[in-house]
């Protein structure tokens, strides 16, 4: 009996040992000793966060022995991963799937397809991303410009009834493939040629599949109020939630009137129209040089555009409109417009139009600068940076409770071209400059704008909060150190102060360095057919 008892005790000992080992490592990751800002806007609280199989499974206090990996977040903030709702990654993400500029800025999920430009075949796009794998989660809108160009090319006219039906069918297919909504870019070709009823028809289709309507509105300068009203009216007519992209005032005579433009949004919300806005925290925008020309000049394809831009009479007409717009903006020249990327001559990158004009030995006046712009557009155009906004408006818009933070950026190849710094530092800039330094926002409010508010707006389930059952998209940062380092003069610099970024429970950024891990997933819209 003693022998049997000894054997039994030995077995029980090893059974308990094995059980304790299993119990000891029941979590993949435990983040300890931090202050949790959960994304709701509520005050921070002290807690550990436990992660298992890509999900948050516990919020409380845990032993280090319970986890395979322990992250010490002492004196740091633990918050949900940032959701960037306005990006353009259609090309770049497949070339650089690690999306470094986003990860270093704390972004774990992105929405692409904005400003009316997306992949047409989203099922194929999503499949390709799943094959290459990415470091960020990705969702997409379906672009109005993409659909219109496919059906009508770049013609300057209304669609026929048949063409309208064709466009609506393409939007419907995209929604079934998982688009989160419809996006317009109403200053771009060919979307700028559309009238409101055309867009309403497409938005109604997106609404049928629980999508939203995101719009780069028709004018962000002298007619910005009318453009905001149009976006709101599309929401009203189509019964669809509205997202006004990169909300701004880029007309000098209207600087300081953001209280009025925000008021239009608030009035619509009081009416029962679901309107939100997003913003990048900079006083400069970035888009293509073609937007500096009247839209009619860019219709009907490259060959026709070339004829217009080399015809003396047509050039005169274009120049007259450009100078009229310049005067309306209370400007004497085009020195606000900087070249970010010009394939024809990269030595011009980083210089403004006035500087380039002088460099080429031309007369220093607005007329010759307008001619230079036409010449550059004729040679393929350039990506530009426009310094046209006021700090007062940026700060006021940022404080509006329904404003989200968005970069309006793509995947950036480090040290190539002279891009807008927003692609590197939008979130860190808000947390460093506007929360810590200027105290425009509470920390908890800023985090909400980057996390749960975007998730709610784009109907992204189980992300955007530190909550049990939610995806373990987590950012850990030092609120006293987080800062953007990218500037307009030196844009290629990653944000600092973010130590860890977890995407679906996997450390993609660890101790401030990208690990190369690609744990991102596809974010499908509610209309996705299984």
Would you name each region that the model predicts?
Residues 141-142, 150, 154-161, 165-189, ...:
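Active-site neighborhoods of metal-dependent hydrolases
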Residues 26-31, 36-81, 484:
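Histidine-rich, glycine-flanked metal-binding segment
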Residues 34, 395-402, 408, 475-521:
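C-terminal cap of metal-dependent C-N hydrolases
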Residues 173, 179-231:
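Divalent metal-binding pocket/active-site signature
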Residues 34, 49, 54, 75, ...:
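Divalent metal-coordination and catalytic microenvironments
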Residues 73-78, 82-89, 94-184, 203-210, ...:
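Divalent-metal coordination cores built from histidine and acidic residues
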Residues 1-26:
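Bacterial Sec-dependent N-terminal signal peptides
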Residues 36-48, 354, 381-394, 441-447, ...:
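Acidic, glycine-enriched loop/beta-strand segments at the rims
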């Amino acid at each position: 009996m003693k022998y049997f008892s000894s054997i039994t005790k030995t077995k029980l000992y090893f059974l308990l040992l094995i059980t304790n080992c299993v119990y000891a490592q029941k979590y993949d990751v435990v983040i300890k000793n931090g202050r949790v800002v959960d994304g709701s806007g509520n005050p921070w609280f002290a807690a550990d966060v436990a992660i298992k199989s890509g999900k948050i499974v516990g919020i409380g206090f845990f032993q280090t022995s319970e986890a395979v990996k322990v992250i010490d977040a002492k004196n740091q903030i633990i918050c949900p991963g940032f959701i960037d709702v306005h990006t353009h990654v259609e090309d770049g993400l497949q070339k650089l799937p690690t999306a470094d500029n986003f990860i270093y800025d704390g972004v774990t999920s992105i929405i692409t397809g904005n400003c009316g430009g997306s992949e047409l075949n989203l099922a194929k796009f999503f499949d390709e991303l799943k094959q290459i794998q990415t470091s960020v989660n990705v969702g997409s809108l379906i672009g109005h410009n993409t659909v219109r160009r496919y059906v009508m090319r770049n013609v300057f006219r209304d669609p026929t009834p048949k063409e309208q039906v064709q466009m609506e069918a393409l939007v419907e297919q995209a929604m079934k493939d998982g688009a989160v909504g419809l996006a317009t870019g109403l200053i771009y070709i060919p979307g700028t040629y559309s009238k409101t009823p055309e867009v309403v028809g497409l938005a109604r289709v997106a609404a049928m599949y629980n999508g939203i309507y995101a719009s780069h509105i028709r004018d962000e300068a002298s007619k910005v109020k009318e453009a905001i009203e149009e976006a709101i009216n599309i929401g009203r007519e189509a019964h669809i939630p509205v997202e006004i992209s990169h909300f701004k005032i880029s007309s000098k005579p209207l600087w300081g009137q953001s209280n009025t433009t925000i008021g239009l949004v608030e009035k619509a919300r009081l009416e029962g129209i679901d309107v939100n806005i997003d913003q990048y925290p900079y006083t400069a925008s970035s888009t293509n040089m073609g937007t500096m020309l009247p839209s009619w000049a860019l219709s009907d394809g490259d060959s026709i555009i070339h004829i217009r831009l080399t015809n003396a009479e047509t050039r005169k007409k274009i120049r007259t409109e450009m100078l009229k717009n310049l005067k309306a903006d209370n400007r004497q020249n085009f020195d606000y417009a900087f070249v970010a990327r010009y394939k024809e001559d990269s030595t011009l990158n980083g210089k403004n139009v006035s500087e380039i004009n002088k460099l080429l030995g031309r007369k220093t006046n607005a007329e010759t600068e307008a001619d230079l712009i036409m010449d550059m557009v004729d040679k393929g155009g350039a990506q530009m940076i426009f310094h046209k906004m006021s700090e007062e408006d940026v700060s006021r818009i940022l404080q509006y409770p329904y404003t989200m933070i968005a970069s309006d950026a793509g995947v950036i190849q480090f040290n190539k071209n002279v891009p807008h710094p927003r692609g590197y530092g939008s979130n860190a800039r808000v947390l460093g400059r506007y929360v810590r330094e200027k105290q425009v926002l509470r920390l908890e409010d800023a985090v909400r704008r980057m996390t749960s508010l975007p998730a709610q707006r784009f109907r992204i389930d189980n992300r955007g909060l530190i909550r049990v059952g939610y995806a373990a998209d987590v950012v850990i940062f030092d609120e006293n150190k987080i800062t953007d380092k990218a500037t307009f003069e030196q844009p290629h610099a990653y944000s600092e102060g973010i130590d860890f970024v977890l995407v679906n429970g996997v450390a993609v950024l660890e101790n401030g360095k990208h690990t190369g891990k690609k744990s991102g997933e596809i974010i499908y819209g509610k209309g996705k057919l299984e």
